[in-house]
Every structure is written in C-alpha cells, then in structure tokens.
C-alpha cells in the first residue's frame, strides 16, 4: 500500500503560515538559531491565550478586558507575569525593561507603534486579534513550537468534526439551523456576525446565519431599539453580557419581557442559551475557542435551554 502523503488540513495551514513567517525580518533567524526559551511579550488577548496553549509563559502580557487583571481561565498560568498596560495602549517603557526577544502584536491594534516596537525587539505583527488559528500557527512557528501548534490544530479539527455530527443528529431534518449571537449591553444589543471570533467557530460547526447577518459587513450589528429584534430572529440564540453591570442585567430583564422578543423562534422553542462572555467575545485564542465548544456541546446534549 502506498503511504498517504497528503497533508492534513492543519498541517497545510501551519506549513503555509510558517513559510510566510520566515520571510519576516528577524523572525526566521530568531526562531531557527535560538535554543533557549524566548522571552516573549504578548500585546493582545488571543496571543496570551495562544502562548499558554503552546506551553510558553510570556515575560509580559497586557491587561484583560474584563475579570481584571487577567481572565480567570488564564490565571493559573499567568498570575505571576508582569503586565505592560492595556491592549490598546501598551507601555513601551515597561516593554523595554522586560528585555523581550519577541513581541507579538496586531496591526489592528498596534500599527501606529510598530516602528517603536521594532526598535525594541523582533516583532510578530499579525493582522487581526481574533483569527485564533492563524495566531496559533504563526506563534508556534516563531517560537519553535510548530509541533505543538500542529497538534492543537489537529485536536481542534477532530473536536469540531465530532461536535458537528452531534449537532446534525440533534437537529435532524432541520440542520443547519440558523443562529444569532447576542451581547446584551446597557443601552443596546450587539449581534455578532460570521466574521467575528464567535461567528467563525459557529460557521465552522456548520450553523447557518440569518439573512441580515449574511449580508452585513464587519463583526457585529448594533440594535438600538427592541423594534429591531426581528432582524436577529433565528432558531437558536447564544447570549451573553459582555458588560457585567446592573444596567446590562436590567436591559436583559426588560428584553425577555418584550412582546417582540417573545415572538422570536428561539425564545418560543426554548433555545436561548446563556454563555460565557469571555470565551465567546474576549478570549481570541484556541483555549477560549475550546471553551466555546464546551458550551455548544451542552446544546447538543440537552433538549432545551434551562
């Protein structure tokens, strides 16, 4: 029998990203010649998540968006790591003092300070903060952790395939069902789109999207009034409150009593699922994405939302 030399999708992804990475100034040389552990600073949440997943403890991280100073799920690994400010405004002085070998940044957040970062250290500059597979693969290549990254991507694809099959069984005859991801804020609702972090995971699982979500651009839609609720009407809702405040909870309490809400399919069918805002909206990495799968698995195993 001739051995199958076809690259697994995760291997192809990692190889393509790794080759692109080696073309970046300084990165390929640092990764290939350095044998001791890199001193790495991560300037966005998904990079911190990915470093932990790869078994690397950064020498510096930025503050989390909530559950400050660091998300609870990352605290066991990062509790003792120094902080270098906010994701949107990292402290260059603190970064210099930590003497990093590699800074992982995002063009979306850090384009303006990129020339200054490059004077401090080699910089791995990713485009977005929520493309978790690309972040994982590129960081794995930059830190000589290609094998670990490949294994994590393979585990992810196997888990997605299994969960997709469970969802197809649960919603037999109706699959793919439509989905909306709703963030209940103090004075409005955000509906996350296929291009968002959560949206990319749901699309990979095979969920369908509402017409409004398919036609929209960007990562979210803002619904300023309850009268806009029919726009997000879907078979299943995943909802969370990114702002953990009394005002956001009050808005949610009013929302579920509104006649328009009660006429939507998901509430009528008891398919409204409360999920973790950090995992679904703020984590941006492979560990956070797997926490999403944990919660979606509950949907596949249950008859209705509690």
Protein language model features and the residues they cover:
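C-terminal segment of N-terminal export signals and the immediately downstream linker at the start
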Residues: 26-42, 46
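Ligand-binding pocket segment of bilobal, Venus flytrap-like solute-binding proteins
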Residues: 217-246
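Basic- and aromatic-lined ligand-binding clefts that recognize polyanionic substrates
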Residues: 39-54, 151-212
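Structured C-terminal subdomain patch of bacterial secreted/periplasmic proteins
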Residues: 38, 239-306
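Proline-aspartate-enriched helix->loop->beta-strand connector
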Residues: 99-103, 234
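Extracytoplasmic substrate-binding proteins
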Residues: 113-187, 271, 279-306
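A short, structured surface patch at a secondary-structure boundary
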Residues: 39, 47-97
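N-terminal secretory signal peptides
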Residues: 1-13, 20-24, 31-32
């Amino acid at each position: 029998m001739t051995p199958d030399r076809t690259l697994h999708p995760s291997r192809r992804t990692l190889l393509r990203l790794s080759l692109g990475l080696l073309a970046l100034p300084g990165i390929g040389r640092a990764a290939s010649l350095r044998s001791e552990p890199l001193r790495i600073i991560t300037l966005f949440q998904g990079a911190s998540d990915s470093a932990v997943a790869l078994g690397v403890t950064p020498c510096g991280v930025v503050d989390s968006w909530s559950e400050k100073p660091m998300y609870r799920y990352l605290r066991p690994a990062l509790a003792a790591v120094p902080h270098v400010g906010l994701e949107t405004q990292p402290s260059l002085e603190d970064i210099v003092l930590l003497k990093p070998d590699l800074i992982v940044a995002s063009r979306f957040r850090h384009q303006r300070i990129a020339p200054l970062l490059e004077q401090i250290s080699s910089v791995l500059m990713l485009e977005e903060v929520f493309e978790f597979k690309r972040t994982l693969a590129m960081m794995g290549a930059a830190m000589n952790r290609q094998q670990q990254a490949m294994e994590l991507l393979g585990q992810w694809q196997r888990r997605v395939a299994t969960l997709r099959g469970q969802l197809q069984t649960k919603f037999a005859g109706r699959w793919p069902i439509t989905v909306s991801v709703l963030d209940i804020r103090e004075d409005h609702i955000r509906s996350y789109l296929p291009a968002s972090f959560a949206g990319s995971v749901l699309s990979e699982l095979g969920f369908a999207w509402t017409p409004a979500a398919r036609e929209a651009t960007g990562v979210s839609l803002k619904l300023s009034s309850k009268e806009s609720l029919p726009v997000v009407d879907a078979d299943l809702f995943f909802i969370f409150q990114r702002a953990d405040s009394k005002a956001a909870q009050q808005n949610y309490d009013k929302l579920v009593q509104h006649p328009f809400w009660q006429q939507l399919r998901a509430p009528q069918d008891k398919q409204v699922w409360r999920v973790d805002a950090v995992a679904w909206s703020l984590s941006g990495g492979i560990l956070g994405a797997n926490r999403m799968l944990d919660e979606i698995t509950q949907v596949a195993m249950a008859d209705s939302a509690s």
